[in-house]
């Protein structure tokens, strides 16, 4: 049985919690809650989390499905180097971002989800995982000369290979020289 790659689960959990934080922050800010500034903070924190978590990391084994438009954000995330690559840093960052949003009812669900993502990232870091970007594969163009095969010498319909008889040397020479061929079956022109 294969090892579980915890970072993949943490990435999905953190991205969902960022979206939940944005939604809760919009509700708190638009609804003019008494502590609406926590709602505004949740919107900003949710956007930051979504930008950080949108690019998926490359899996150790198998293939990784790249998100739509991920290559643009991947280059931005790569700029921060070890701050975004190290899962200990991500676990601490997500936990610290989740604390202020916990003081408002509209954002408490996003807070809990982000805290869970932080714990999963911590587990991934303990197991030695780290974020590596998905690099685009160079497209290999087939070489023109390597793909062309010899055309068949026998016109269709062709009998199966085991039924075909091997041409003798004399027939091969006649065929290659372009000379007349002798029909082995007698042909009669009688109409019955």
Curated annotation (Swiss-Prot):
Task: Please state what the protein is called.
Answer: Cytochrome b-245 light chain
Q: Which InterPro entries match?
A: Cyt_b558_asu
Residues annotated with Phosphoserine modification: 168, 176
Give the family, as the similarity comment puts it: Belongs to the p22phox family.
**Record note on disruption phenotype:** Mice show defects in invadopodia biogenesis. Mutants have a very sever defect in controlling bacterial replication. Mice show spontaneous trunk curland head bobbing and fail to exhibit contact-rghting reflex.
Task: Tell me the residues linked by Glycyl lysine isopeptide (Lys-Gly) (interchain with G-Cter in ubiquitin).
Answer: 149
As for what it does, the entry says: Subunit of NADPH oxidase complexes that is required for the NADPH oxidase activity that generates, in various cell types, superoxide from molecular oxygen utilizing NADPH as an electron donor. Subunit of the phagocyte NADPH oxidase complex that mediates the transfer of electrons from cytosolic NADPH to O2 to produce the superoxide anion (O2(-)). In the activated complex, electrons are first transferred from NADPH to flavin adenine dinucleotide (FAD) and subsequently transferred via two heme molecules to molecular oxygen, producing superoxide through an outer-sphere reaction.
Q: How does it assemble?
A: Component of the phagocyte NADPH oxidase core complex/cytochrome b558 complex, composed of CYBB (heavy chain (beta)) and CYBA (light chain (alpha)). Component of the phagocyte NADPH oxidase complex composed of an obligatory core heterodimer formed by the membrane proteins CYBA and CYBB and the cytosolic regulatory subunits NCF1/p47-phox, NCF2/p67-phox, NCF4/p40-phox and the small GTPase RAC1 or RAC2. Interacts with NCF1 (via SH3 domain). Interacts with SH3PXD2A. Interacts with DUOX1, DUOX2 and TPO. Interacts with NOX4; this interaction mediates superoxide generation.
Segments spanning the bilayer are 8-30, 36-53, 87-104, 106-126
Ranges in the Extracellular compartment? 31-35, 105
Disulphide connectivity of cysteines: none
Q: Which residues lie within the membrane without crossing it?
A: 70-80
Q: Where in the cell is it found?
A: Cell membrane
Post-translational modifications: Ubiquitinated at Lys-149 likely by RNF145. Phosphorylation at Thr-147 enhances NADPH oxidase activity by promoting NCF1/p47-phox binding.
Q: Which residues carry this modification: Phosphothreonine?
A: 147
Q: Which controlled-vocabulary keywords does the entry list?
A: Cell membrane, Electron transport, Heme, Iron, Isopeptide bond, Membrane, Metal-binding, NADP, Oxidoreductase, Phosphoprotein, Transmembrane, Transmembrane helix, Transport, Ubl conjugation
Where do the record's region annotations for Disordered lie?
A: 134-192
Q: Which GO terms describe its molecular function?
A: electron transfer activity; heme binding; metal ion binding; protein heterodimerization activity; SH3 domain binding; superoxide-generating NAD(P)H oxidase activity
Gene Ontology biological-process entries? cellular response to angiotensin; cellular response to gamma radiation; cellular response to glucose stimulus; cellular response to L-glutamine; cellular response to mechanical stimulus; cellular response to tumor necrosis factor; cytochrome complex assembly; establishment of localization in cell
Tissue distribution of the protein: The strongest level of expression is found in kidney, peritoneal neutrophils and peritoneal macrophages, and a lower level in spleen and small intestine. Very low level of expression can be noted in brain, liver, testis, and heart.
Q: How does it sit in the membrane?
A: Multi-pass membrane protein
What ranges does the Cytoplasmic topological domain annotation cover?
A: 2-7, 54-69, 81-86, 127-192
Organism expressing this protein natively: Mus musculus (Mouse)
Per the record, GO CC terms? apical plasma membrane; cytoplasm; dendrite; endosome; focal adhesion; mitochondrion; NADPH oxidase complex; neuronal cell body
């Amino acid at each position: 049985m294969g090892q579980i790659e915890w970072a993949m689960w943490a990435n999905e959990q953190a991205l969902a919690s960022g979206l939940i934080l944005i939604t809760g922050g919009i509700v708190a800010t638009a609804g003019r809650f008494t502590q609406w500034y926590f709602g505004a903070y949740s919107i900003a924190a949710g956007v930051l989390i979504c930008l950080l978590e949108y690019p998926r990391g490359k899996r150790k084994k198998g293939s990784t499905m790249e998100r739509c438009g991920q290559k643009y954000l991947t280059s931005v995330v790569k700029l921060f180097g070890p701050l975004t690559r190290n899962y200990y840093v991500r676990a601490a960052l997500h936990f610290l971002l989740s604390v202020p949003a916990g003081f408002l009812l509209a954002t408490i669900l996003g807070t809990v989800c982000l805290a869970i993502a932080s714990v999963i990232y911590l587990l991934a870091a303990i197991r030695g995982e780290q974020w590596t970007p998905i690099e685009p594969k160079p497209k290999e163009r087939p070489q023109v000369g390597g793909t062309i095969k010899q055309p068949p010498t026998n016109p269709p319909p062709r009998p199966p290979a085991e039924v075909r008889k091997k041409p003798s040397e004399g027939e091969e020479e006649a065929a290659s020289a372009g000379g007349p061929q002798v029909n082995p079956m007698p042909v009669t022109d009688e109409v019955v």
